[in-house]
Amino acid sequence: MENKDKKRQKKWLLIAAAGILLLITAAAVCVYMLPIGVLPVKDYSRMEALPADHLLTAEEVWADREQCIRIVEETHPYFITAEEQSGYAAAREHYVAATNGPMTAGDFQSATAEFLCFFGDGHTGVRWVEEEYLNLPQVYADGKTWNVDENGVRLHSVETIGGVSVNEVYAAIDRIFPAENEMARQRNRQQRITGRNILTLAGAAIQDDTVTVTFSDGVEAEYTFRQPVSNAVTSQEGSGPINRWYMDGDVFVIDFNQCNDDDEMKAIAADLKNAVDHGQTKVIIDVRGNPGGSSNACTRLLNAMGMAAPQYDVLVRFSPLAQQGRGYFRQSGEFCFTGSDAAVKRNESVRLAVLCDRVTFSSATMMCVYVRDGGHGVLIGEPSSNMPSAFGDILYFSLENSHVNACISHKQFIRPDEANTERMLVPDIQTDPQDAYEAAMDWLAQ
């Protein structure tokens, strides 16, 4: 009898051990297969830029070119999803031809930026730095650059800068900076046209830090370079990553400047939930000028209003760079997550207006897509420069010899409304970004 008990006990111990081993194996497989960060993340440090006229040897150029091509082909989801890749082959061939010998660091950076621009991905490109801009107040509108007065009123269109046609400067900008849609192209031109490095690349004459600009009325004027970094005229760009809420009459307004899912955002969401639970029916979420961050901050706000967002389809590509930056176990392959619309939950008692502009990007654009595809409210303002379905989740890298700093996507996000392939998310109510808030208040007053 005692021997039978021992055998039975041994049997159950073996079964338990096998079960534990099976669970460990299943967990290990999940950790390996899923995009879960389990390994230590390698800190990325941006390399200090070399002087633009620093001469790279042919060997240094070739080494950096091959490093860039290898990282791109190992990392970007394009190589998983694109059935036709002849366009990339041509871009690569052009890059190789343009970097086939000794050249300056500035010229190599420009060639690399043009190569990365092929993907038309706002999350992939050279991290171009401009330290000085012409002190020319300007705005890009109707296909032209206009100088403006202190009130932002257009005066005359710019014809030449430093003796170079403004169209040649546009062409240089379009070659260097990726644009996912027409709004992105307009934003790039407005932000970049007065940068010293771009003007130098376009061949503009610069004398003693002064550039001559001619206008459509025939007038010539001299402008000098200045700091700080940007002179772009946008609704809220530069307002800083500070999120807050306030009441404007009977409207709960969230000034959502950056998608940080932090304690500050949790407190805002808690206050919003409390307000909705006690009868708040009018809400504005202002993502004008919001460059993105974590989409969890967006879903947190929707959940606080008794809403649930539809889900994106997501493709994650594993690579050595992604392993360094995210701690994935795998260095190759991909993982696909298929989103579900079944989770969508609306709250018909809440009237929601989301304000957006061309600077709204990445996770902030996702907020707009959640609202549009989930039927949660209306969008007011101008389209985002980010496509509704887009590449994203940035990884950073630097090229060893040239010190070119760049970034690249390792995921692809497909919007919940998969059949909609529009490149721009056009708001329900289109207005100048500066007028979006007033338009939202008018809509909520109806």
Residue ranges and their predicted role:
Residues 39-48, 55, 59, 66, ...:
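C-terminal "post-core" interaction segments
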Residues 2-283, 289-291, 307, 394, ...:
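Flexible, low-complexity junctional segments that flank or bridge functional domains
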